[in-house]
Amino acid sequence: MSRNELFDVTVIGGGPAGLYSAFYSGLRGMKAKIIEYQPMLGGKVHVYPEKMIWDVGGLTPISGAKLIEQLVQQGLTFHPEVLLNEKVESIARNEEGLFELHTAASGVHLSKTVIVAVGGGILNPQKLQIEGAERFEVSNLNYTVKSLQHFKDKTVIVSGGGNSAVDWANELEPVAKKVYLAYRKDALSGHEAQVDQLLNSSVSCFFHTEITKLIASEDHEVIERVELTNAQTGEVMELPVDEVVINHGYERDTSLLENSRLDVTRVDDYYIAGTSNCQSSVPGLYAAGDIVHYEGKLHLIAGAFQDAANAVNSAKRFIDPEAHKSAMVSSHNEVFKERNRELVKKMFV
C-alpha cells in the first residue's frame, strides 16, 4: 500500500494496547494501520518472555512469549497494514483536517484519526559507564534477561536495586550457580515482597557498591571478573563471574510529542492527559495503554484492552457521529460468522 493512502485510524505502537486497538478497529469496520518502532510486534512484553502472567482476565497463567503470540494473532485478524522498524517522529494536521504522521524511513502517513499506544515509550537502557564496556555486549554483558536458560549453572552479578534488578535476581537465583547483586545505595527500592524474597534467598548483596572495572579474559572476548568498589569504605574487590546483568534504569524518548505541531496536554512531561474515553486534548487524537493518564487509570494489560476499545469507539464516532457507541459483541457479530463455522467444524472433527 502507498504511504499516502488514507486510513481511518493509525495506531502508533504494536504492544498490547496497539494490537487490541487494531483488532477492535477491524471489529468496527475501520481501515487501520500499525506503525511500530521495534522490528517485531508485542511491545514491552518482550522484556520478560519467560515470566508467567496471571492477571489477564480469562487466561490461565501464560508466559510473556505465548501472550505475545496470541496478541499478535488477534491483532492481525482484520489484516491491518503493519509497518515495523518505523519511528513516528512527529504528528501534524493538514489544512484538510487529516493527521500527517512523519516517519524517519518512509515520509508522511495520512490518517483520519490517531491512537497513540507507545506504552512507556521508546526505552533505552542506561548503559554501564565504563570505558570499553560496549564491546562485551555481544558476549556476556546483558541489559535484559530474555532467557533464563542462558544463565543456567553460571555465576551472575546483577547491578541495580530497582524493581527490574530485584526481579531479575530473584528469577535467576534458582537457575544460576550463584547470583550476586551490587547496588550503590544502602537499601533496595523494589517492591516490598520482591525485596523480602531476595534478602531471604541465597543471593549475596553488596550495598554502597558499584562495578568500577570489567576485567576481560586473555582473548579479550568476555568479562572474566568484575571490580567492585564500596563507596563508603573504599574497599575494592574482584569477583569472578560468567555473566553481568545491568539494570540502571531507562532513558525515555519523549521526542514524538515534543516534535509534534499539536497542543497535546501532558502529565509529568510525558503521559498524555486523557478522559476515561481516552480522548486527548486534540480532537481525533486518542491514547491507550500506559501512555494515557486519567483518574482511575488501570496500569495493567487488562486495562490496556479497555483503553484500546474506548479509543477506537471514540475514533469511530469522531469520523461518523451517527455510529453506534460500541461494536456488537463478538459472540453475535456477523463479521465472525464464517470464521465461527470453521472453528466449530474443527471442534467436532
From Swiss-Prot:
Keywords: FAD, Flavoprotein, NADP, Oxidoreductase. GO terms for molecular function: ferredoxin-NADP+ reductase activity; flavin adenine dinucleotide binding; NADP binding. This is Ferredoxin--NADP reductase 1. PANTHER family: THIOREDOXIN REDUCTASE 1-RELATED-RELATED (PTHR48105). The keyword Oxidoreductase applies. It is an enzyme of class 1 (oxidoreductase). The keyword Protein biosynthesis does not apply. Its cofactor is FAD. The lineage of its organism: Bacteria, Bacillati, Bacillota, Bacilli, Bacillales. It comes from Bacillus licheniformis (strain ATCC 14580 / DSM 13 / JCM 2505 / CCUG 7422 / NBRC 12200 / NCIMB 9375 / NCTC 10341 / NRRL NRS-1264 / Gibson 46).
